[in-house]
């Protein structure tokens, strides 16, 4: 989640991400990491480096060649500025991957006011979560094919819901009465998601619509699990309970007490095979994974647990993650 609300927790989030990357690299698990954003379209464009992408947001070149050329009525609307930015990959050499992680760390530090400039073409933006879920379906299929995987896990790390989605709709122009393609706000309770011959309905709100999108994407990818890691801001526990955990706890206070005791809560749903909710105040990791390359997976898991020995929330995340990849 490369959104503005992540600014204050991006550094600790990066530490968690790097731990997962190091773990996957040690046991030779292929991975791709993407930042979803609507303010990175200028990456690769022939414009000055010190130009903010929003300075050219209405430029016609935004439409080509990076977005769909044909807009069909009834399809979900994907704005031209949306991007899935590939920030880390297991196909990179070790020194290149280390350099990528260093650049990400410096970017996160710069967002907090460090004494150097951040990359202006990769600033924080909104939260195009629904668009990212749609895109990750194709990206996951591609990874499964190229890496010849039998099982795949998609981990979505965010601190909140995505912004309101829209759909393509033919509309009469106000000026000349000509019918043109526009977009209109989407009502989840009136919307049917179709994937081939399958339909997904029943969403009553935005969060449920997002979950239906996950179900739709999973329906096309066998042996694929979705893991949602939700970083809770102060007071965000009630919202998480209302949207996702009502069927798992009798009262909010029950979930709150478990989170205070363990540092995190874990639930299983039809859409996300595992939901992990963590308070941002407990999201912290300082130690590195100490293990020699080439050792067996059992010892890797032991080293990973040792690294997080005194970190309650980290221990739970590691434990649940190992269960998922077993």
Language model regions located:
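Acidic, glycine-rich A-domain
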Residues: 2-326
């Amino acid at each position: 989640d490369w959104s503005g609300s992540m600014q204050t927790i991006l550094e600790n989030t990066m530490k968690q991400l790097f731990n997962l990357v190091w773990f996957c690299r040690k046991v030779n698990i292929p991975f791709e990491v993407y930042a979803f954003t609507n303010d990175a379209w200028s990456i690769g464009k022939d414009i000055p480096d010190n130009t903010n992408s929003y300075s050219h947001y209405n430029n016609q070149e935004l439409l080509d060649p990076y977005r769909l050329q044909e807009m069909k009525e009834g399809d979900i609307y994907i704005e031209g500025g949306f991007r899935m930015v590939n920030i880390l990959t297991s196909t990179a050499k070790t020194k290149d991957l280390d350099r990528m992680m260093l650049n990400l760390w410096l970017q996160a530090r710069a967002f907090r006011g460090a004494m150097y400039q951040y990359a202006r073409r990769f600033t924080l933006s909104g939260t195009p979560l629904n668009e990212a879920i749609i895109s990750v379906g194709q990206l996951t299929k591609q990874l499964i094919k190229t890496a010849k995987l039998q099982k795949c896990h998609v981990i979505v790390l965010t601190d909140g819901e995505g912004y309101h989605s829209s759909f393509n709709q033919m509309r009469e122009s106000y000026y000349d009465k000509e019918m043109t393609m526009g977009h209109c706000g989407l009502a989840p309770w009136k919307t049917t998601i179709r994937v081939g011959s399958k339909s997904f309905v029943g969403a009553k709100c935005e969060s449920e619509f997002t979950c239906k999108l996950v179900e739709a994407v999973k329906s096309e990818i066998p042996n694929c699990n979705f893991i949602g890691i939700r970083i809770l801001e102060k007071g965000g526990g009630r919202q998480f309970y209302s949207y996702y955990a009502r069927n798992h706890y009798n009262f909010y206070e029950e979930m709150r007490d478990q989170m205070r005791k363990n540092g995190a809560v874990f639930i299983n749903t039809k859409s996300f095979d595992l939901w992990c909710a963590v308070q941002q105040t407990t999201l912290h990791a300082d130690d590195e994974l100490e293990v020699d390359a080439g050792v067996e997976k059992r010892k890797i898991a032991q080293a990973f647990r040792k690294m997080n020995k005194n970190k309650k929330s980290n221990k739970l995340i590691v434990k649940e993650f190992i269960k998922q990849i077993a």
